[in-house]
Amino acid sequence: MKSIKRVEKVTSHLSDFGQWYTDICLKAELIAYSDVKGFIIYLPYGYALWENIQKYLNYEFQKTGHQNVYFPLVFSEKLFQKEKDHIQGFSPEAAMITSTGQKELFEKLVIRPTSEVLFSQYYAKIISSYRDLPKLYNQFCNVVRWEKATKPFLRGKEFLWQEGHTVHATEKEALDQTLFAIQLYEKLGKELLALPFVCGRKTEKEKFAGALITYSIEALMQDGQALQAGTSHYLGTNFAQSFQIQFQDQDHQNKYVHQTSWGVSTRLIGALIMVHSDDEGLILPPYIAPIQIVIIPLQPKNELVQAEAKKIFDDLKTTYRVHLDLQNKTPGWKFSQYELKGVPLRIEIGARDLAQGEVTIFQRYNNSKNNFSKNTFKAEIPKLLKTIHDKMYQKAQKHLEANRRQASTYQEFKDHLQKKGYVAMSISGMDAEIKIKTETGATARVILETPLITPNCPVTDKKAIQTVLFAKSY
Amino acid sequence: MKSIKRVEKVTSHLSDFGQWYTDICLKAELIAYSDVKGFIIYLPYGYALWENIQKYLNYEFQKTGHQNVYFPLVFSEKLFQKEKDHIQGFSPEAAMITSTGQKELFEKLVIRPTSEVLFSQYYAKIISSYRDLPKLYNQFCNVVRWEKATKPFLRGKEFLWQEGHTVHATEKEALDQTLFAIQLYEKLGKELLALPFVCGRKTEKEKFAGALITYSIEALMQDGQALQAGTSHYLGTNFAQSFQIQFQDQDHQNKYVHQTSWGVSTRLIGALIMVHSDDEGLILPPYIAPIQIVIIPLQPKNELVQAEAKKIFDDLKTTYRVHLDLQNKTPGWKFSQYELKGVPLRIEIGARDLAQGEVTIFQRYNNSKNNFSKNTFKAEIPKLLKTIHDKMYQKAQKHLEANRRQASTYQEFKDHLQKKGYVAMSISGMDAEIKIKTETGATARVILETPLITPNCPVTDKKAIQTVLFAKSY
């Protein structure tokens, strides 16, 4: 007797967005849970998404002269304590190695939650002249932060990321680098992930522990909650002063270096899922999809059909990530399976279509089917993929714009917040920000570079100093 | 005043092999030390070597259907204890997370020294039928082992590696997979690293904790010491029984799966250095070299020379990893610098050569210089690189063969061992192996599939059961 497995259905996103999300993560086989809470297993299909992000960034880094390195997983507690804001921000969630199977360690070791202190210590050793600058290092690695509430990809005790750490002779150069990184992330969103972001500066309250300026890209999920998807920090000379990273400049003066750090993580995969997918499962934009095209013979035992399917597979496989499914399962099962997995294009090869010189192509992003001539469809594929990518980006962009409001009164702010999405308001500063967070649960996402909406802050009635985009967020 | 830095010289390998090795690691800027002993920083030039090994293996894995995944950094102590031999082998050197910045953990967590238990636990959850088999997973990651004596690349508390973990329905299939992996490593050595290995089974004493069979590739360093450079394990049903990984076979019987695991690490980079380099520094085989060709204009301010150098650079950069050095430093300094860094080919562009329509090409592996027509040299480069690679492999192979001896008496064994390198002897088993290790410091590297040299073991005088290749090793 055959064990027949049905393709598993996902929960409706309208009935339970959180369950819908974890259903997709698990049922599309992106991840599995391990036995330690907050640590997930990246399965082949999920890990391939991260590999494609890495490839995209590595390609860009090669053009800009950023070099990959690998710094240690651990550092001493002493090192951690050198920059005060930084340790205050990260210490509570840092994991410690205190012993081995055999004995206690003399000194506790911190597992990196981020690596500013390691890079700073190294830079202090090797930088002495303006000729040693800039240094443009990046590493892909795992980091550990002991988060309480965890959710696959979005927040884990361990996650995978890329962290850039650069050192410059001047403030201007470091500020340019900070902007370079956040613009690179915007480009990554636009070109690979089909994700539009709101990009801007973080408020004093929300900026990175140890930074002077933090820029962030923020994505808006389908449930109207925001997600911080990447950050870029101008560290000024904070770490340089704590670690004594000095250089002799061309004018013979000893000066502190200016530093930046910036990162995106596997969290981007969470955004990808939450922005694009539907109740049938995952919907992947074509350029990041591990399988871009799946070929399904409708009568797999029909020799003509099988031969044609193989021919098309061989034709396409040099250009695209393509999969030919010859499993002994029904076409219906296979359709559901690859819809669940969000494969952008499905080519159905059927005897009837072939008799008419045609194939059927299904597009996952709008669940549409069209017939194409089997002799000419190949030339259409680049256009199809491009259109799918563009439409997915535009749809997400439209959702973002439709859920971006502004408020002139605190009541209006609260009313807008009920509708989910972003609300802009001009505020007096951190006091207003804290009050808003306590009373509404919304946090400052980014500062907008736009004129004030109201001269006074609707929350404190003090003079407004900046317009800030608020939202509830993951 | 300019600060003039000399290219740093390395210690002679004949006077102090250990110092020569670490000099190259540090001065060729492959690594730097961190402040925690045993944890090293992989600098761009060193990390690029590992990236090229990863690319090679990923390309091969794609052909064979091995899929990349990422499993957690940690697991529970309970999980660790499930396979008895395994925990006995790895427990003493396992690092533990016991607390965070805020509080003690309820349960100690083990940082992976290797991930058999994590994969086994996952496989137990997802495998139920022969249709679920095989699973061919691989991960690139960091692992932690609390080694006492550490040496860059060769032995560290943290290292980077690739670990394959596969599951099969039959013993035969798993044994084939075990051999597939070790043969892949031999191919990697032959095609990318120009490293010949002795390949064979480990003795019972030396095999992996938890395995039935371990195959190993062993490289021979220039000082005559062996280095285990990669291993592949047939785990039998050991882990399957401990973790209850069972499947219903086509004959409806429930059976335990057969597993394999196999890995190579950044240790390969240590072998690369110790086998190929000389007293001028690193010598890199061309296909793994991060910079394959460096172009040095001898009169960088001469416009003709500069234009020609740039033209050649543009010509070559689409095909090779090529670097044009326009720094304001003397050609002599640059020559030493790239010799220290082991760049396989140096193209010198000089006014006098150009007047005769020529360029000079320096080959690092034999420190030879030849003139080539500047119009035709480009076509010679693939041949040059291939020849360099082949000659480097042959030289290492010759060294290996010249240092491989056999012994019919224990005294002969000891005499041969004085000359360094490998000594084969037919032994009675583990008792002889232990005696040899205690008395001579040599360990069993691999079992040879050759006829017995002597009917009795020269050490114990008992009946010999196998011929084993011994050596002192790293």
Swiss-Prot record, chains A, B:
Pfam families registered for this protein in UniProt: HGTP_anticodon, ProRS-C_1, tRNA-synt_2b
PROSITE patterns given in the database record: AA_TRNA_LIGASE_II
InterPro entries: aa-tRNA-synt_IIb (IPR002314), aa-tRNA-synth_II (IPR006195), aa-tRNA-synth_II/BPL/LPL (IPR045864), Anticodon-bd (IPR004154), Anticodon-bd_dom_sf (IPR036621), Pro-tRNA-ligase_IIa (IPR002316), Pro-tRNA-ligase_IIa_arc-type (IPR004499), Pro-tRNA_ligase_II_C (IPR016061)
Reactions the enzyme catalyzes: tRNA(Pro) + L-proline + ATP = L-prolyl-tRNA(Pro) + AMP + diphosphate
GO cellular component: aminoacyl-tRNA synthetase multienzyme complex; cytoplasm
Keywords: Aminoacyl-tRNA synthetase, ATP-binding, Cytoplasm, Ligase, Nucleotide-binding, Protein biosynthesis
EC number: 6.1.1.15
Cell compartment(s), UniProt: Cytoplasm
Taxonomy, superkingdom: Bacteria
Molecular function per GO: ATP binding; proline-tRNA ligase activity
Chief subcellular location: cytoplasm
Gene Ontology biological-process entries: prolyl-tRNA aminoacylation
Gene3D superfamilies hit by this protein: Anticodon-binding domain, Bira Bifunctional Protein, Domain 2, C-terminal domain of ProRS
Top-rank EC class of the record's enzyme: ligase
Quaternary structure and partners: Homodimer.
PANTHER family: BIFUNCTIONAL GLUTAMATE_PROLINE--TRNA LIGASE, PROLYL-TRNA SYNTHETASE
Family, similarity comment: Belongs to the class-II aminoacyl-tRNA synthetase family. ProS type 3 subfamily.
Written domain comment of the UniProt record: Consists of three domains: the N-terminal catalytic domain, the anticodon-binding domain and the C-terminal extension.
Annotated function: Catalyzes the attachment of proline to tRNA(Pro) in a two-step reaction: proline is first activated by ATP to form Pro-AMP and then transferred to the acceptor end of tRNA(Pro).
Protein name: Proline--tRNA ligase
Source species: Phytoplasma australiense
